[in-house]
């Protein structure tokens, strides 16, 4: 190593240390080392921290593009986290849509055999919907409509690739200053139902469909539509619709609004125990949505009612939602593309080891950086 310089604002004075003969640079961000290709230059700005790691904004000196770099530290310490990282990389490389976040690069590790951290480079967005909602910014009726339209437009493409997002929530809905929306965080995505979903992560339950709360192993794209309904209600009211403290409370909040399901609405539950459990819950009539959401446009209320249906088989589909009257100012089927080829999760073998995943991620980084 040789030479040091400083970058960043007065708030974050971040030292730059060249490594590996100057091919890489190292930054100390929040006490964590951040080592990336030298093309990523200051200003380096921390923009987020989460369970998966730290995210910094930087500039690609080759293209001049502003990017977001996510460091996933100790990415191969356990198989679940390793699979999640590989899954997101492969999914985002497969997809190409205006309303889905773009992966720009995987920083190629300096040494093939000795690396534990993964750096994923995305296009930089200005904020996310959760931050907007928490800041008490008032979204206009037109802004709300455009956000919901873009979310559904992106979701149509995702579903056409045979992918279920499974974790749509405001913090995964990314925005820029032009009010353009992109869906992010595909780490929990799947093509089909997976029993390991329930144990894999504690997903924010506020946006989870009833069939997931009830441990239903056979679920469909309708789970994402439920989440969009929760988001629609929240951007219209400024408050989460179902801020459950636990699973029981979550189900109660849902049934208090949409009404307790009758027997004909429980066909999606294969388990007798699950059906018995739902039947013994306190009974609630469906609320009048117009009374509950007095400031929402009538057409928005109608769309919300069609999304927040307890029985997933009766929930509106993404294509039907895009064609709904509420979204008619934006809807144009010719400008709502689908994915040309379905995504395959064949790389996820049950016998897959951390070392195998490490090798696959290395190969992904080489695809971005063949002349390293």
From Swiss-Prot:
Keywords: ATP-binding, Auxin signaling pathway, Cell membrane, Kinase, Membrane, Nucleotide-binding, Nucleus, Phosphoprotein, Serine/threonine-protein kinase, Transferase. The active site is at 167 (proton acceptor). Autophosphorylated. Dually phosphorylated on Thr-199 and Tyr-201, which activates the enzyme. Activated by auxin. Dephosphorylated and inactivated by IBR5. It catalyses: L-seryl-[protein] + ATP = O-phospho-L-seryl-[protein] + ADP + H(+); L-threonyl-[protein] + ATP = O-phospho-L-threonyl-[protein] + ADP + H(+). One of its GO terms (cellular component) is plasma membrane. Activated by threonine and tyrosine phosphorylation. The keyword Aminoacyl-tRNA synthetase does not apply. The keyword Kinase applies. The modification Phosphotyrosine is found at residue 201. The modification Phosphothreonine is found at residues 199, 204. Residues 210-372 are annotated as: IBR5 binding. Expressed in seedlings, roots, stems, leaves, flowers and siliques, mostly around stomata. It is a peripheral membrane protein. Its EC number is 2.7.11.24. It is an enzyme of class 2 (transferase). It is found in: Nucleus; Cell membrane. A motif (TXY) lies at residues 199-201. InterPro entries: Kinase-like_dom_sf, MAP_kinase, Prot_kinase_dom, Tyr_kinase_AS, Tyr_kinase_cat_dom. One of its GO terms (molecular function) is ATP binding. ATP binds at residues 47-55, 70. The TXY motif contains the threonine and tyrosine residues whose phosphorylation activates the MAP kinases. Negative regulator of the auxin transduction signaling pathway. Involved in stomatal movement regulation by phosphorylating and repressing HT1 and HT1-mediated GHR1 phosphorylation. Required for CO(2)-mediated stomatal movements (e.g. closure). Interacts with IBR5/SKIP33. Binds to HT1. This is Mitogen-activated protein kinase 12. It comes from Arabidopsis thaliana.
């Amino acid at each position: 190593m040789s030479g040091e310089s400083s970058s960043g604002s007065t708030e974050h004075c971040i030292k730059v240390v060249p490594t590996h003969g100057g091919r890489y640079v190292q930054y100390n961000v929040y006490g964590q080392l951040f080592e990336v290709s030298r093309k990523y230059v200051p200003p380096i700005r921390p923009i987020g921290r989460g369970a998966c790691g730290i995210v910094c904004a930087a500039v690609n000196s080759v293209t001049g593009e502003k990017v977001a770099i996510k460091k996933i530290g100790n990415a191969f310490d356990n198989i679940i986290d390793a699979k999640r990282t590989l899954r997101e990389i492969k999914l985002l490389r497969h997809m190409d849509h205006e309303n889905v976040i773009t992966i720009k690069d995987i920083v190629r590790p300096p040494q093939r055999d000795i690396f534990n951290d993964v750096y994923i480079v995305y296009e930089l967005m200005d904020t996310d919907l959760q931050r907007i909602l928490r800041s008490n910014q008032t979204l206009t009726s037109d802004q709300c409509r455009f956000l919901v339209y873009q979310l559904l437009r992106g979701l149509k493409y995702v579903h056409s690739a045979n992918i279920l997002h499974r974790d749509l929530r405001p913090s995964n809905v990314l925005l820029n200053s032009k009010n353009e929306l992109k869906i992010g965080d595909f780490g929990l995505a799947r093509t089909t139902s997976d029993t390991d979903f329930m144990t894999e992560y504690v997903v924010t339950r506020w946006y989870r469909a009833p069939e997931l709360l009830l441990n239903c192993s056979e679920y469909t794209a309708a789970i994402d539509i439920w989440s969009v309904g929760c988001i629609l209600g929240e951007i219209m009211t400024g408050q989460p619709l179902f801020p459950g403290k636990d699973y029981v409370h979550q189900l109660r909040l849902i049934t208090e609004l949409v009404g307790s399901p009758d027997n004909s609405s429980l066909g999606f539950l294969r388990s007798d125990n699950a059906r018995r459990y739902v039947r013994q819950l306190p009974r609630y009539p469906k609320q009048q949505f117009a009374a509950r959401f007095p400031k929402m446009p009538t057409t928005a209320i109608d769309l919300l009612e069609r999304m927040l249906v307890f029985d997933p088989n009766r929930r509106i589909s993404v294509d039907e939602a895009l064609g709904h009257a509420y979204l008619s100012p934006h809807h144009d089927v010719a400008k709502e593309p689908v994915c040309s080829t379905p995504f395959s999760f064949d790389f996820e073998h049950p016998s897959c080891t951390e070392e195998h995943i490490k090798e696959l991620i290395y190969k992904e980084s080489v695809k971005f950086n063949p002349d390293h």
